[in-house]
């Protein structure tokens, strides 16, 4: 696990665009909405839209390089766990990308309509859930060599979008925050198990 964490953090630090590109995209989209001078409720919606687009862009390259250079296949052939690999990728993105995105959203919106701690936590859970689902779409696209296969995750996102709207636009934390947390747990387990299953056909007999 430690080795995987060091690898993923090093990959992000050694390629600075992995940090500044998503944060720049997020900030630019957010700035556009601010210039358009929407009211506060639409600012929360713009925060979600900016997050949605940014996480989607990140997910497009999450596994691409490791898949193309054979790193994932090598791990499978060596019998090394993909769970620690997936966990390390999530922790590195959470620490270096999603936490700064949450800070930017907090500084701009302020989450003034409710408790800051709960809204900050909900925002991180929202970003993490998007991360898992978009990664599933990215993995399906790589495995089948067809980006349209990623559309399969859209039905899974519909209930999630409704939950996010009720939390950040309607400001209804209870019981939606609990539902959002349950959706996060579902996405983390279901998606990671699916990713491991998707990778299994690439095994080769030594």
Please provide the spans of the model-predicted regions.
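Aromatic- and glycine-rich beta-strand/loop motifs that create alpha-glucan
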Residues: 1-22
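Hydrophobic alpha-helical transmembrane segments of multi-pass membrane transport/permease proteins
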Residues: 15-37, 45-56, 98, 151-163, ...
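Helix-loop-helix units of permease transmembrane domains in multi-pass membrane transporters
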Residues: 62-94
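Selective transmembrane-helix segments that form parts of the transport pathway or gating/packing helices
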Residues: 82-109, 184
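Secretory targeting signals
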Residues: 97, 101-129
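A structural motif at transmembrane helix-loop-helix junctions in multipass membrane proteins
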Residues: 122-157
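Transmembrane alpha-helical segments of integral membrane proteins
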Residues: 134-135, 159-169
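Single conserved hydrophobic/aromatic residue that forms the stacking wall/gate
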Residues: 196-206
């Amino acid at each position: 696990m430690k080795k995987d964490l060091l690898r993923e953090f090093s990959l992000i630090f050694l390629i600075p665009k992995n940090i500044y590109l998503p944060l720049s995209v997020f900030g630019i989209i957010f700035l556009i909405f601010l210039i358009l001078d929407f009211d506060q409720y639409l600012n929360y919606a713009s925060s979600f839209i900016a997050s949605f687009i940014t996480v989607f862009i990140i997910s497009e390259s999450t596994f691409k390089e490791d898949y193309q250079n054979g790193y994932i296949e090598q791990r499978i052939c060596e019998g090394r766990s993909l769970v620690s690999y997936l966990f390390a990728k999530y922790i590195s993105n959470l620490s270096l990308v999603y936490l700064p995105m949450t800070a930017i959203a907090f500084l701009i919106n302020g989450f003034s309509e409710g408790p800051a701690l709960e809204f900050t936590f909900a925002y991180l859970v929202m970003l993490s859930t998007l991360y898992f689902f978009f990664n599933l779409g990215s993995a399906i696209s790589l495995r089948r060599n067809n980006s349209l296969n990623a559309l399969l995750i859209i039905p899974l996102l519909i209930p999630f979008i409704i939950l996010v709207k009720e939390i950040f636009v309607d400001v209804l934390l209870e019981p939606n925050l609990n539902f959002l947390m349950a959706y996060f747990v579902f996405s983390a387990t279901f998606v990671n198990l699916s990713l491991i299953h998707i990778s299994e056909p690439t095994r080769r007999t030594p």
